[in-house]
Amino acid sequence: MTISTTTLGSGATTATRKEVEAKYEEERQIQLQSRGMVQDIEITRNASFEQFAKDPWAAPKQVDVETQREKLLQQAHHKIVIIGAGFGGLLFAVRLIQTGKFKANDIILVDSAAGFGGTWYWNRYPGLMCDTESYIYMPLLEETEYMPRNKYASGNEIREHAERIAEKYNLSERAIFRTVVQSLDWEEEEKVWKIAGVKLGKDDECQQPFQLMADFAIMASGAFASPRVPNYPNIFDYKGKLFHTARWDYKYTGGSIENPKMSGLTNKRVAIIGTGATAIQIVPQLARNSRELFVFQRTPAAVDVRNNYPTDPARFKSEIQGDGPGWQRRRQINFNAFTCNEKTLPTDNKVGDGWTRMPSFSVLIGGPQSLEPDYIDEIRPIDMARQSEIRSRVHKLVQSTAIADSLTPWYPGWCKRPCFHDEYLQSFNSSNVQLVDIRHDGISRFTPKGLVANGVEYELDAIILSTGYTVPVTRASPSGRANIAVTGRRGVTMEEKWANGLATLHGVMTRDLPNLFFAGTSQAGACVNLTYALDQNAIHVAHILSEAVKRQPSDCTKLVIQPTHEGEEAWTMEILQRAAGFRGIAGCTPGYLNGYGMDASSLKPEEQMNMARLAAWGQGIASYVDALEGWRSEGQLEGVEMTFLA
């Protein structure tokens, strides 16, 4: 089906909309047939793929300095162990400290990386930036008194900010790095969590077992912990350079994250597989530095304007900080109002970017109007108009009509993560850049010299995998995402709870896994600004723990806390009542947002119900936070079971 790229402006007719919807479905069917569910390789469980998991940033000298301190930390029994030292783990630690009931010395953070930052530690590819405004994304700006350098911060600056937070709250010496947690086991007799895994030496292959004991454990390892490597046929037949964007190899490419002049690629034929939010930042850099660049694309990205610019100190002080203490949270809430498409929007759009001009993204993250029966029908024309502008932008910026056609996205805006960049599309005007559209046949196989796609062998010096992260569809629990076996009372595992009918209290704790807290989207709030959602989890868990400690009698040394059965089932009913808010995702092109095209209608009724229990809070992040704050204000810890032991 051929439709004009300018189709569907403000005056679009019903017939035109039907044509576009038919085009959307046509593209969806093409991709379902060519891909369906892609099998990924578990890189941490496959010796042949360990190269994709190794840490290229850990300095041997740094490992030596930390070894003795970490041995001491491992020997002691700890009050709280947090798994993950990215922003999630840091926010849990900071909010606990701010209650006044816990000190930094009560907390240990454990991470497989060699430093703070989480995904911002691992990702250091050229062009890396965050596409959520830095003034709302970088947490604790008021507390650290830091002004971001640009509206959209570089990955380097964000990682430095994680280190800044750790230093301010005395957490720098409370982390055990290069440590892979493999299991959490509840010891019923001692009422503690036994945390076990391996400590990595200078060489990742040198592994020593470790064990920690903790009264409380918090899982904050994040959703982007493991690079996704598709199981392409004969991938290891390839004799050239092969690496993942999350483990960028500057030794091969030349340059650095501070200076992405990649002199090592000057005479190289380079391929990048994938055109998601990562690739659109890398492609302009590779285009400038490679002799030839081949971009392998299955689904075109919908790329809007980013419009980054340096922070003006005077404006930052007068306009952004101008309304006094609490400015960052108010700005975050303002941003959420637009992205969740609240019925009554604020009079001023403080962030004023591409995200806040996309009310249809509320179909994915939920919003106050999401449960209304006609909401999808009402929001669809608005989204179609936006997508039409995105398609027009492609043809305006890309000189070749054929290439522009291949780069044109035909799907609802909420189906694939929106992208924002000012150089990506123009890169395809360069004579050394070739787009390879693989949406019909995909990549057939790798060869010693390159790979085969669409029946053509491409001889390549280097292949870069921009294929994202493993987001398990059937292992959606925090333990499944992190590859950690979590076993609670009576042998109940976290995986079983998620698979067999999840119930939580507020999306942060679940029965039979006592003294364990977690971050995630299942039965919790979702929003564009991930650090805001993580912070709300952290604030809530800190409240529950600190209030429980206040209630602990002085003659009791042990506290065991978990939801009541009634409490977590009541919360789950609230989730189920709002699950229909996400119904718009069902007809999307395959991707991690919809289980790579999983057809829920083919599941048995009980399986569909179990999936619905995994949903986020369907009425938007503001409604979720209101529910938590209302619960906290009552002061009763309703739905929480506390046991005090001498």
Swiss-Prot record:
Q: Where is this site: Transition state stabilizer?
A: 417
Q: Give me the ranges of the annotated region Disordered.
A: 1-20
Pfam families this protein is in? Answer: Pyr_redox_2
Q: Which reaction does it catalyse?
A: preaustinoid A + AH2 + O2 = preaustinoid A1 + A + H2O
Quick check: keyword Metal-binding in the entry?
no
Q: Does the keyword Ion transport apply?
A: no
Q: What's the cofactor?
A: FAD
* Top-level taxon of origin: Eukaryota
Query: What's an example of a GO molecular-function annotation for this chain?
Result: monooxygenase activity
Q: Name one GO biological process term.
A: terpenoid biosynthetic process
- Composition bias, kind Low complexity: at what positions? 1-15
For this protein, what does the record note about how its cofactor is bound?
A: Binds 1 FAD per subunit.
| Pathway(s) of this molecule | Secondary metabolite biosynthesis; terpenoid biosynthesis
Q: Where does NADP(+) bind?
A: 129-131, 275-281, 298-299
- Which UniProt keywords are present, listed alphabetically? FAD, Flavoprotein, Monooxygenase, NADP, Oxidoreductase
Q: What does this protein do?
A: FAD-binding monooxygenase; part of the gene cluster A that mediates the biosynthesis of the fungal meroterpenoid acetoxydehydroaustin. The first step of the pathway is the synthesis of 3,5-dimethylorsellinic acid by the polyketide synthase ausA. 3,5-dimethylorsellinic acid is then prenylated by the polyprenyl transferase ausN. Further epoxidation by the FAD-dependent monooxygenase ausM and cyclization by the probable terpene cyclase ausL lead to the formation of protoaustinoid A.
Please state which protein family the record places this protein in.
Belongs to the FAD-binding monooxygenase family.
In its UniProt entry, what is this protein called?
A: FAD-binding monooxygenase ausC
Name the species this protein comes from: Penicillium brasilianum
In the UniProt record, the gene name given for this protein reads ausC
